[in-house]
Amino acid sequence: GRRWYRHLPAGYGWGCVGLGVFGLGGLADMAWHLVLGVEAGVDALLSPSHLVLFTGGLLILTSALRSRWGSGDVTSPVAIGGLALVTALVSFFLLYVSEFTASAPTLAFRALPEGHPQHTASELPATAGLGGFLITTALLVVPLIWTWQRARAPRGLLTTLVALISWLSAAVVDLDRAAVVGAAGATLGAVVAEFALDWLERRDLRARLRIPVLAAAAIVPTWTMHIAALAAGVGLSWPVELWSGAVVVSGLAAAALGGLAVSAPAAAVTAPRAASVSPSA
């Protein structure tokens, strides 16, 4: 007879693997806590047993998404909802490097000259903040790029991702004022970016430019409004070179990620596009 796993719907095989991984992770986590105690801070996000649970959960949550994408349906509510849910899960495990929890431009900045004994230490908060901008940029842009490779992203996808990640991050830090203000600004920026994305998609950009340009256009307004909201609602400590540079370098990083996507086989990128402009039922 046929093996049981061959009866699974397309895309759900790895979900079954995820169930096993999650179960093993739960047992490992219980043993870890009994022997080493319970984590209380950032170490909880890096605990090996928690990372096993994360891996299993990721495999489970992406089952419906893999199934939809396998059929060429990347813009239905199920596919978009699955993509947003997976992105939220990844963002939770990256909270320690998220701009939405750090609100880095509001943190104290003290510039000390090269050669000063405290020069490196004084710049650590700013460099960590810049890294947070870049990592959060990748977190937002990668799901968009995966969608753009296969279809025109539906309106509202960027706003959904930004709102979900930013407001969940604000909730994790007990609705800290800076986090709430930053989330509101980023969400408004994403709405503005949606208009730019829609306009650019109607310009029929050259294939090699389309995704890099769209990626930059998604990120620059989002971070610009995020920082503008922080400036108005909390106040910035970073000098203009830092906060403006954070926006520019994030836009460049987004475009670079989009450029890497262009190197994918043409059949995988362009063939489904015309067929997927209108969401499938």
Where are these regions (language model features)?
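Membrane-interface helix-loop-helix junctions at boundaries between adjacent transmembrane segments
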Residues: 3-17, 27-82
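Membrane-water interface signatures at transmembrane helix termini and the short loops
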Residues: 166-195, 236-245
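Membrane-interfacial, low-structure loops and terminal tails that flank and connect transmembrane helices
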Residues: 1-12, 71-78, 203-205, 267-281
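Hydrophobic cores of alpha-helical transmembrane segments in multi-pass inner/ER membrane proteins
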Residues: 51-67, 130-146, 184-197, 245-265
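Hydrophobic alpha-helical membrane segments
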Residues: 18-26, 186-193, 209-230, 248-252
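Membrane-interface interhelical loops and short amphipathic "cap" helices
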Residues: 31-48, 97-124, 174-178, 231-243
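Cytoplasm-facing juxtamembrane segments at the starts of transmembrane helices
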Residues: 10-17, 72-87, 148-164, 205-217
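Aromatic-anchored segments of alpha-helical transmembrane domains
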Residues: 22-30, 85-95, 161-173, 216-229
